[in-house]
A protein has these predicted regions:
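A conserved acidic beta->alpha catalytic loop
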Residues: 23, 38-48, 67, 90, ...
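Flexible acidic/His/Gly-enriched loops in nucleotide-sugar-dependent glycosyltransferase catalytic domains
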Residues: 100-167
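Conserved nucleotide-sugar donor-binding catalytic segment
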Residues: 139-219
């Protein structure tokens, strides 16, 4: 029975989209539609996708958009999806054979579940890493959302989860954010969607560490404030403000680490101060202390080096 709408946002993905579609071929029996949102591409993304889908006998529909934003592109498709289940995957990732059917099977075994999360594998610089298994989730919505925001459970890669269209309802991805929009979307869904997990790997998630870090270096303060504004809107789901402050600290620490690694110690120090002020688990307290020490050492070294040069 064709019960799944597959949603793929794509921007200049001509080089990868055929591979992503090919990875879905084994799931054709349960796929009712593939909604490809061609988001302001300047290459042949749509044409390549249409040719591949025709060859693979996948029911592709291309939606043209000018969102220039992955969250906005997904939102367009969510508004047009027709099937009872939604599966989202990015245009440069790969689905693993049997993954989608396994997610559906778990939803049949646990009929109350409206969100099913599977394992995934990260691939960085051509190297496969260990499978990331979902852990720590409970049947309680707010507890799952809070633990997710606080980094106490495994994060969900887009492409490793199946969600009922009924549970999604009018929920949409926040737009115009440089990062973490998927976290806010999953957290909002978890508040009301009973969740189940499977340990079977569902997809391979391709990660560019450099591209991920670049998001934190462009207009870092402006982007952080925009993201924090979207984060704080989760209070309308019943999530505690202390949980949102913890998330602020986690993201601020990540930004501080990126700027430290790239030699921008002043920006690193500013974001480290935000992280230090947020509620933390012991491991994050230690990370903050470690980076404070490293910053102090590097700054002292820089001052000493400057004095030697001017002598």
């Amino acid at each position: 029975m064709k019960t799944v709408s597959v949603i793929i946002p794509a921007h200049n993905a001509a080089a990868t989209i055929a591979g992503t579609l090919a990875s879905l071929r084994s799931e054709a029996a349960v796929i009712g539609e593939v909604l490809l949102v061609d988001d302001a591409s300047s290459d042949d993304t749509a044409a390549v996708a249409e040719e591949a889908a025709s060859r693979l006998a996948l029911p592709l529909r291309v939606i043209a958009s000018n969102c220039r934003d992955a969250g906005g592109a997904r939102n367009l498709a969510l508004a047009q999806a027709d099937c009872p289940w939604i599966y989202m995957i990015d245009a440069d990732d790969l689905h693993l054979e049997g993954g989608l059917r396994s997610l559906l099977s778990r939803s049949d075994a646990q009929p109350r579940a409206e969100m099913v999360v599977g394992a995934f594998r990260r691939r960085t610089k051509g190297e496969h890493h260990q499978f990331k298994l979902p852990y720590g989730y409970t049947v309680t919505g707010i507890a799952n959302a809070s633990a997710y925001l606080e980094g106490q459970v495994r994060s969900i890669a887009v492409g490793s989860a199946l969600v009922s269209r009924r549970a999604i309802g009018e929920t949409r991805f926040p737009t115009a954010l440089a990062y973490d929009e998927d976290t806010l979307f999953w957290a909002r869904l978890m508040c009301r969607a009973p969740l189940a997990v499977i340990t079977q790997p569902v997809m391979t998630y391709f990660v560019s560490a450099e591209r991920s870090d670049d998001r934190f270096t462009i207009k870092p303060a402006q982007r952080f404030l925009a993201w924090r504004h979207a984060l704080r809107q989760l209070t309308d789901c019943g999530i505690a403000k202390s949980t949102l402050k913890t998330r602020e600290g986690l993201v601020a620490l990540k930004i501080a680490r990126v700027h430290y690694a790239r030699g921008d110690f002043d920006t690193a120090a500013r974001f480290l101060a935000v992280a230090k002020a947020a509620p933390k688990v012991p491991s994050d307290i230690w990370r903050c202390m470690r980076y404070q020490l490293k910053l102090a050492v590097r700054r002292r070294f820089s001052i000493s080096h400057a004095l030697l040069q001017s002598a």
